[in-house]
Structures are given as C-alpha cells and as structure tokens.
Amino acid sequence: MDFPILSAMIAVPLVAGIIVLFLNDNGARWTALLATLANFALGVVLWQAYEIGGDRWQFTEYVGLGEGTLVPAWALGIDGIALMLIMLSVFLMPICIGASWRAITRRVPEYMGAFLLMEALMVGVFAAQDLLLFYIFFEGGLIPMYLIIGIWGGAEKIKAAYKFFLYTLFGSVLMLVAMLYMILDAGTTSIPALMAYDFPAGVQWWLWLAFFASFAVKMPMWPVHTWLPDAHVQAPTAGSVILAGVLLKMGGYGFIRFSLPMFPEASADFVPLVFILSGIAVVYTSLVALVQRDMKKLIAYSSVAHMAFVTFGLFAFNRQGIEGGLIVMLSHGLVSGALFLCVGVVYDRLHTREIARYGGLADNMPGYAVLFLLFTMASIGLPGTSGFVGEFLALVGTYEMSSWAAIVATTGIILGAGYMLWLYWRMCYGTQKNADAAAMPDLSMREWWLLVPIAAVVMWMGIYPESFMAPMRDDVGHLLERIEPAQVHFDARPTEGTGVAAASVTDTATDHKGGAH
C-alpha cells in the first residue's frame, strides 16, 4: 500500500483535536465522534490490507536523515501484534466519545481534544519504529490522561492525577537513560535493528531493570500498582475505559517489543522475579477486590490481577504462554472497558458507585443485567467468551515453565469468580433496597450502541479466536527464535513420576537443540 495509512491514523485525530478547540460543545462532540469513526474505518482497512505470512514489518514509512544517524526519525511500521493493539485503540475511542456525550458538560471542546490527542499518541506508540519517536509517543500519553483525570475527575482528582503522573514519570526517566546508552552503543535508533542487536549480558541486566521500571508501572505490576485504583475512581467513565482498555497494554507491549527481544538473557534471568511479583499480584489484589465497596475500585484491582496473567504468559518463554498473554491483553481491554461502561451507566442515573446502594436491578433494568452478566462471565473466563482463551493458554504456558506458578495463577481465577459474581449478585439480584435505584430506567439507545459492539467482539474472540491470533502468530515465532537460546533458571516444575524439580524446561530444550546441531 503506497498510501501512508499509519501517518493518516495519527494525523486524523491530531488535526481534529485542534479543530474541536474552536467549536461549541455540540460541534466538538460531533467532530470528535466523526474523527474517531473515520480512524476506526482506517483501522479496518489496515487490518484487511495486512498480509498474514508476508513481510514482518508492513506499511513502513521513513522520513529522516538516513539510516544509522542518531537523530529521531519519523519511522513507522507494524507487525501483527501492533496491528491488533491499534485496532483495540481505534475500536474503543468512538465508544469513549459516546460515553462522554451527556456525562461531560464542562469544557467539552478541551475534553474532546484531550481524547483525540490521546488516540493519536496511542496509535503512534504501537506504530513507532524509532526508539526516540516511541519514547515521545509513550510519554506524551501522560499529558492528556493527566488532564482528563485532573480537570474532569472526581472530588480527589488532583491527588489522583499527581500520583498517576509521578509514578509513571519515575520509571520513564530510567528508561530514557537506558535508551540513550543503547543508541550510543548500537549506533542506531531503529527498533527493528535494536531487536536484533546483541548487548553484553552484564549490561543487559541494567538495561532490563531500567525498562522494567517503566513497563511495570504502566501494566501495573505489584507493588507499583497503587496509582491505578485512585486514577480509576477519580477519572470520568471514558477515562477509565481508555486507561484500562489501552494505556495499561502499553506496558505489556513494551515487554514484547523491548525487554524480551532486546535483552533475552536478562529476561531469562529475571523470570523468577516476574513470576513472584505476578503471583503476589494475582492473590493479593484479588483478595483486596473482595472487600471493596466501590465498583470502580473493585474493577481496578481486578485489572491488576488480570494483567498478572499477561506477565505470567509473556515470561513463560513458550508459544502458548506468549500467545495467551497477548489474547489476555486484547480481551482485558474489551472486558474491563465494558465493565467501566456498565458502572458509568448506573452512576449517571444515581451518582454513586457504592455497591450497597444498588440491588435487584434485573427487575427494572433487564437489558443492563444481561450485558453486565456477559461481561462478568468474560472477566471470570467462561468458555465461549474472550476471557477463557487467553487465560487458558497463559496457564498452559506458565505450567510448562513452573507448575507452582500455574497453581498460584489458578487461585486467581477462583478468587476472580468470587469477587465478580459477588459484585453482580449485589448489583442485579436480591431485594431492591433503594427506591431511586428501583426507579432507574433500562439502557437508552445510545448505551445499547456503546455496549453491544463490545459484547459482539467479546463473543467473537471467545468462539473464533483464530481471527485475532492469526496476524500475531508469525511475530510470536520471531520472538521465540530470539529468546529461545536464553536459558531460564527456574527450578519449579516437578519431573514426571517424581517429586523432584527439573533443572529447567528451557535448559532441556536447549540441550536438544545443541544435539541437533
């Protein structure tokens, strides 16, 4: 394709974001909606034009001083993994605009401009093929989200916005230092070139830790997750949707694009650390979710637990784990976004997120109850929904690396069923304790239009996940070729027929490879 479609997908929301600043409230709303729908249409064209099994990097664009220079270049291109994450971004953004249609009445043009800027930066993160360009997009996303929380958030919005900004900024400074070292050492800012460059094993440790500091906060991983519940509670509904749906995925994307392929030996050495932190996150945040009174906080803590499945899968160093982690990222983006929309539906009517104020909503809001049930089941991982496919593959991959880690991860699924079903029961079943809640009308036509598309994709991914796996399969293969020579030292899986831990699954695989040569 000769048309610079990736540049267009960055330019459309960026230009529209400037235009809306000069319009009235309704003009800003309609312009933002049309711009995001146009970008989604471009995304569909991108997906249709993507050639599965073709070149590793497609739709490439380059404007710069030439290869080998140390100056940032406008270098764009995507593989299948980036394609799926871009599709997730452009799919959710029109829904966010629709969710804000009536909820936001103050400084509407600026609000719409912030979301459009966010969309441009998100596409840029996943499409960037220049290291410094990636950093600009990656950190630029802080600004609109900081404004969305700090201006249009709840009562403690300033505290939440500062916490969000400071946490993410700290990790980003370390990552920038590491990037500068990498550029000077390798002599290039090209991400594909750096993915094939072999940094010394000792240096890889420090570079890996610097990148980990940034990506772990973005995921977020325990114990640097404490900014997320506050950010979700204070953010407007659409802010929570895009935060959980896309921004958290930037951390997982960073592990896939940088940590694993650029520092494979260090990644292998730090597998025990990642598994321990992920195991704590699954159990601890699930237990914390069980005692929450605020709907948004409960879903926020569940997000930390679900993203732990991503890190389990990605660092399992096998195909099932990595593919599972990627599908969990996509599924969580859809399901968590939908759950926050469900919270927004009742909050717009009763203006409270306290679970105890609701009950028996299935009587007067049956349509809402059905869709809320679907997203609850998807969050739990019910077969036939998107949540099952990714979690199952991630667990299988984790078991191949460590049976004990897989057991811990499985407890997270059990606890997840506990807090999600308990939330649903308290919201939709039982007696109606509040006359105001009992009088709430069912979903409006606008709300149906927001939730039904997500429900359709959740079912599509659960019934036929191949549509989403196929574009990413070759890229997972490229990643495995890069990381397989690294030996993981994690003595945690019992050998068959004994209770003695095997030396390492990957050690054995490496020995077989050595014999084959």
Model-derived features with residue positions:
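Transmembrane helix-loop-helix hairpins at membrane boundaries of multipass inner-membrane proteins
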Residues: 1-5, 19-113, 188-196, 499-500, ...
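N-terminal signal-anchor/start-transfer transmembrane helix
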Residues: 8-25, 213, 220
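Hydrophobic alpha-helical membrane-insertion segments
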Residues: 34-49, 168-177, 376-378, 414, ...
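Hydrophobic transmembrane alpha-helices and their helix-loop junctions in integral membrane proteins
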Residues: 95-102, 120-132, 145-422
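Cytoplasmic juxtamembrane regions at transmembrane-helix boundaries
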Residues: 98-114, 237, 245, 437-446
